[in-house]
UniProtKB/Swiss-Prot annotation:
Cofactor binding comment, as recorded: Binds 1 zinc ion per subunit.
Recorded name of the encoding gene: mutM
Family, as annotated: Belongs to the FPG family.
EC code: 3.2.2.23, 4.2.99.18
Keyword DNA-binding found: yes
Name this protein carries in UniProt: Formamidopyrimidine-DNA glycosylase
């Protein structure tokens, strides 16, 4: 699933081609995604795109009348292509520009979304989200306050979007390893020093992934069609049975709900 670094990588890739340009119209070949494609999108004609933003894992295209809100789902990606590029099997939506280019949305598993909101204040999908992890609002003090009394394992707790957005399975595993915190530790047991270190490692891991164009494990591609390269730097995720790169201990895997967790039993306490 594309996580925050992949979505931010996509935003940075498409923004120069969309921002300040004019939307001609949209072509929707498959409206049945996670939620039905908003019918308003089919009525848009010759509208300027004012900005290309991101909130959590959502891409936000600002138009004068409202916002196109895009979620990449489990397997989605967006690319900038010439408008006459023939569609392939899983190319479900094209946003065509008046300059002869287009934004193409590809989603093999069709679990993404293309929605319309007159205002972000009414965007139900953005309600109740926690702070951005790379913002000043996500601090050690904030994390420690939220952790107080929590008897939830720290790994799934970090993945709760009401706590902080965009720390998905890959980056929660990698951040906990870097902070040397066992994923089964209770959130409420974190010390002030551990909270400080964990916040710093989350920010560092996410920033490194953004700098590397995200993590491509299966379907994700950058806006130019290239994969992300952070997968080559993963320390524990997907490495069960292999030696820890720090101490040589065998990397273990466990389940938290439906998510697989990877960790080093020696480095993480």
């Amino acid at each position: 699933m594309p996580e925050l670094p992949e979505v931010e990588t996509s935003r940075r890739g498409i923004a120069p081609f969309l921002q300040g340009k004019t939307l001609s119209h949209l072509t929707v070949r498959q409206p049945r995604l996670r939620w039905p494609v908003s019918e308003t999108l089919l009525t848009l004609r010759d509208r300027p795109i004012l900005s290309v933003q991101r909130r959590a894992k959502y891409l936000l295209l600002e138009l004068p009348e409202g916002w196109i809100v895009i979620h990449l789902g489990m397997s989605g990606s967006v690319r900038i292509l010439p408008a006459l590029t023939p569609p392939q099997k899983h190319d479900h939506i094209d946003l065509l520009l008046t300059d002869g280019m287009m934004l193409r949305y590809t989603d093999p598993r069709r679990f993404g979304a293309w929605l319309w909101y007159d205002s972000l204040a009414t965007a139900s999908v953005l309600a109740h989200l926690g702070p951005e992890p790379l913002s000043e609002a996500f601090s050690a003090e904030y994390l420690l306050e939220k952790a107080r009394g929590r008897r939830t394992a720290v790994k799934p707790w970090l993945m709760d979007n009401t706590l902080v957005v965009g720390v998905g399975n890959i980056y929660a595993s990698e951040s906990l390893f870097s902070a040397q915190i066992h994923p089964d530790r209770l959130a409420g047991s974190l010390s002030a020093d551990e909270a400080h270190l964990l916040v710093q490692t989350i920010k560092a891991v996410l920033q490194r992934s953004i700098d590397q164009g995200g993590t491509t494990l299966r379907d994700f591609l950058q806006a130019d069609g290239k994969p992300g390269y952070f997968a080559q730097q993963l320390q524990v995720y997907g490495r069960a049975g292999e030696a820890c790169l720090t101490c040589g201990t065998t990397i273990k895997r466990s389940k938290h709900g439906q998510r697989t967790t990877f960790y080093c039993p020696h480095c993480q306490r």
